């Protein structure tokens, strides 16, 4: 194991071996593998901002498999997306890139002073898809932050 990866893992000594193995999996993948640096392709904007606003300028973006291929060709460390996008390609691309399931999402259909994302996926679903991690957005300081921490 490269020294930098071992150093990063030393910060997670209280975590279980599965979590640590997934960290190694992410940190050793892609063009920056082994450097301790990450480039994660996040594709939740279709949910967050709407598919037309997000993908109309590049129609290939409507296809969830496009993003898997983009992440691979770009040498990304991992690919993060909502449940539907990952379900579309997790089996086809199994083991080719670490996956991160975005477990909550928010839309911008109306302005909110204190947004509260909806839980849209579970840890069980992340495990079923072979994900290395989950992503969960929290808005610290909002009146809903306690609810988000509890989720």
What function would you assign to each model-found segment?
Residues 33, 38-40, 45-151:
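Alpha/beta enzyme core
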Residues 1-43:
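N-terminal basic, low-complexity leaders that serve as flexible interaction/assembly modules and, when applicable
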């Amino acid at each position: 194991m490269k020294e930098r990866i071992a150093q990063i893992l030393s910060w997670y000594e209280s975590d279980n071996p599965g979590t640590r193995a997934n960290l190694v999996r992410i940190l050793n993948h892609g063009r920056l593998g082994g450097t301790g640096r990450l480039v994660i392709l996040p594709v939740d904007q279709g949910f967050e901002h709407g598919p037309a606003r997000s993908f109309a300028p590049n129609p290939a973006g409507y296809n969830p498999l496009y993003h898997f291929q983009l992440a691979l060709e770009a040498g990304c460390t991992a690919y993060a997306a909502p449940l539907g996008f990952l379900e579309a390609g997790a089996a086809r691309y199994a083991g080719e890139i670490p996956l991160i399931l975005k477990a909550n999402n928010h839309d911008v259909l109306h302005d909110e002073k204190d947004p509260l994302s909806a839980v849209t996926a579970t840890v069980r679903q992340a495990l079923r898809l072979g994900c290395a991690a989950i992503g969960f957005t929290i808005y610290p300081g909002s009146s809903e932050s306690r609810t988000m921490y509890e989720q």
